[in-house]
Amino acid sequence: MWDLYINNSTCDPKDLAAKTGDDARNEFLNKKAVFYQNGTWEYTQLIDGGLTDDDMTMLPIYFGVGDEANQGLCTGTENYWCVNKEADEADIQATLDFMDWCVTSDEGTKCMADDMGFNIPFKKAQESKNLFIKEDKQMTEDGKTPVAWNFSTMPSEEWKNGVGSALTAYAADQTDANWDAVVSAFVDGWASEYKLANE
C-alpha cells in the first residue's frame, strides 16, 4: 500500500518529506489529486475550500485480503480527553463541566460534530451535517465492518517516529535495504519499546 501511495502521488517520492497536510488538502481542492486520505474532521475545511457534498465521498482502503466487500471505513482516534488529578479542584470541576457541555448541550454537540467534524456517539448529540460522518454511519447500518484504529496498542510516540523516519527514507530511495530498515523499525522498534515497558 505504501508503494501505491508514494509512486502515484502528486510529487516525486523523494520530495514527500517536505510536503505537509496543507499541501495535500490544497492539491485535492485544486483537483491535482483524486484521493485525499483524511478523516471526518477535514470536512469543514473542504467545504470552506469550495467543494460540495456532491464533489466527494469516503471509501474504505482495500488491501486485497479477506472479505473486503463487507469492509467499512477506518474509524477511531489516537487521542483521549484527560483530566489532571493533580490540578486544582476548581480547575478539575471546570474541565469536567466543559467536557459535559461538549457532549450534552445543543451548542456543544453542534460545535463538535459540525465545526470540528467529530463523530459524537452520545444520545443527546445532534445529527451531524458532515457528509463523512453520515457515510460512515450508513456503512455501519448496512452491516459493513469498521476497521478499528488501534492507536492505544502502539508502544509509543518514539516508535511511531522511528517507523515514520524509515518510511520517509524508503520513499526517497526505494531499495530493498531501505525497506528492510522499515521492517526493522517496526518489528525491532516494537520489541525494544515492549521491553522498556515491561521490565
Predicted feature descriptions by range:
Residues G21, N38-Y43, T77-N79:
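Beta->alpha turn/N-cap motifs
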Residues E141-E199:
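Conserved C-terminal helix/tail region of periplasmic/extracytoplasmic solute-binding proteins
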Residues N8-T10, G49-M116:
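Extracytoplasmic/periplasmic substrate-recognition and gating elements
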Residues M1, D48-G50, F63-L73, K124-E127, ...:
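Short, solvent-exposed loop/beta-turn-alpha elements that line the ligand-binding surface or hinge
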Residues Y43-G50, A191-Y194:
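Pocket-flanking alpha-helical
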Residues N30-N38:
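Alpha-to-beta junction loops
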Residues M1-A18:
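Glycine-centered hinge/linker elements that transmit conformational signals in sensory
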Residues D15-L29:
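Short helix-initiation/N-cap motifs at beta->coil->alpha
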